[in-house]
Amino acid sequence: MSFPDITPDLKAAMPALRGRLLANESLAPLTWFRVGGPAQVLFTPADADDLAYFLKHLPAELPVYVIGVGSNMIVRDGGVPGVVIRLAPRAFGEVKAEGDIITAGTAARDKRVAEVAASADLAGLEFLFGIPGTIGGALRMNAGANGGETKDILVEATAIDRRGETHRLSNADMKFTYRASGTDAALIFTAVRFRGTPSEPAAIRARMAEVQAHRETAQPIREKTGGSTFKNPPGHSAWKLVDAAGCRGLKVGGAQVSEMHCNFLINTGNATADDIETLGETVRERVKASSGIELQWEIKRIGVKAS
């Protein structure tokens, strides 16, 4: 499927734009599942000012989606109408430590932020070492693992709205809840400030090693996967509910529930986005029938299904 090419009109309306605009660009290579259709427009801004300029001049009726490394996302096979914005590490990936504060661009990998904090002898960010996404995604979904969450360390986030205006949000402004933030969904996060706690370097490194060992032994990290598929319902572990419903190893087309960790869906090699989403919905139905609990997707799904 392809969409009408609107990039010439956008370029004409934004003569000072410095970032890259591409029409009908495949998004599959930009996601961990390696599935999905094209973006009608894929925009990679040169920096935060370029992003603000783009948003200020973008027609309000065009939907906007943001992707990082595509680690917790399904792009549907029909592609994504509107604009997909990809914040590249070269422009939004800097990470530095000053005192007990870690400043990072939102395209920085979570693991990299944990490493910089450890190098500065700052504890509290070790949990990020086990999350395979970017800081932007961590902010949007209050990412967490191994007993830590983004809300525990956030001092301030910087974001740009659809009008191209910059906002600075405190921890309270983010309205964090379990695997979510209550901020305007249209805000695009560009930078963050985290606070760590000075600690013994050996203890920090030991904790990071524990996080990595857990991932290696309990999660299918070498598969094409999107990470944790469903949120844990209050008082329950999603994987246990999936397992109890008999879904471990369940397949739909080229998609499969991981045998190693059944809250992970994997692309065994030839899956479509529809295979993966259908498998997820099948699991939800079986868990509801088995336990009465309705699992909620943690993975973000964007775009339209193939016609």
UniProtKB/Swiss-Prot annotation:
It holds the Pfam family MurB_C. The active site is at 179, 228 (proton donor), 298. It is found in: Cytoplasm. The keyword Secreted does not apply. GO terms for cellular component: cytosol. Residues 34-199 form the FAD-binding PCMH-type domain. Its EC number is 1.3.1.98. GO terms for biological process: cell division; cell wall organization; peptidoglycan biosynthetic process; regulation of cell shape. The keyword Cell wall biogenesis/degradation applies. Pathway: Cell wall biogenesis; peptidoglycan biosynthesis. Keywords: Cell cycle, Cell division, Cell shape, Cell wall biogenesis/degradation, Cytoplasm, FAD, Flavoprotein, NADP, Oxidoreductase, Peptidoglycan synthesis. It catalyses: UDP-N-acetyl-alpha-D-muramate + NADP(+) = UDP-N-acetyl-3-O-(1-carboxyvinyl)-alpha-D-glucosamine + NADPH + H(+). Its cofactor is FAD. It is an enzyme of class 1 (oxidoreductase). GO terms for molecular function: FAD binding; UDP-N-acetylmuramate dehydrogenase activity. Cell wall formation. Belongs to the MurB family. HAMAP family: MurB (MF_00037). PANTHER family: UDP-N-ACETYLENOLPYRUVOYLGLUCOSAMINE REDUCTASE (PTHR21071:SF4). This is UDP-N-acetylenolpyruvoylglucosamine reductase. It comes from Bradyrhizobium sp. (strain ORS 278).
